[in-house]
A protein has these predicted regions:
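N-terminal first-folded block
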Residues: 1-32, 36-37, 41
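Glycine-rich beta-strand-turn "strand-cap" elements at beta-sheet edges
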Residues: 2, 41-49, 75-95
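Localized chelating/binding microdomains
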Residues: 10, 15, 24, 53, ...
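An amphipathic, aromatic/His-enriched active-site/gating alpha helix that lines ligand/cofactor pockets
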Residues: 25, 29-34, 56-89
Length: 95
C-alpha cells in the first residue's frame, strides 16, 4: 500500500472557501476510483489557510491512474494547485 500526505497552504485567505469546495468535490470523486483505500481531506481548526490530504492507494499503479483521472485533472490540478503552496510526503505505514 502507498500512503501519501499532502500539506496545502492557501496562498490567499480570500480563496479558502473556494479551495475547500474544490477539495470536497475532488475527495468524493477520488474515493470512487479503483485502488483508493482511503482519501480524506482535513481543514485545520487552528490555521485556517492549512489543509491536509491523507491518501492511501492499493499500489503505485492505482496512484498513477488517479493522477490521470477526472478528480485530479479537472478539479485538483487546475482549480486547487494554483491557489495553494503544496508539500507532498510519501510514507510507509508502520505495522
Amino acid at each position: 500500500m502507498l500512503c501519501l500526505t499532502v500539506l496545502l497552504l492557501a496562498k490567499d485567505p480570500a480563496h479558502i472557501k473556494e479551495i475547500r469546495e474544490h477539495l470536497s468535490q475532488a475527495m468524493r470523486k477520488s474515493r470512487a476510483e479503483p485502488g483508493c483505500v482511503r482519501f480524506e481531506v482535513y481543514h485545520s481548526q487552528t490555521e485556517p489557510r492549512r489543509f491536509v490530504l491523507v491518501e492511501h492507494w492499493a499500489s503505485q499503479e492505482a496512484l498513477d491512474q488517479h493522477r490521470l483521472a477526472e478528480a485530479y485533472n479537472t478539479i485538483y490540478k487546475p482549480m486547487v494547485m494554483p491557489l495553494v503552496e503544496r508539500e507532498g510526503h510519501p510514507a510507509t505505514l508502520l505495522e
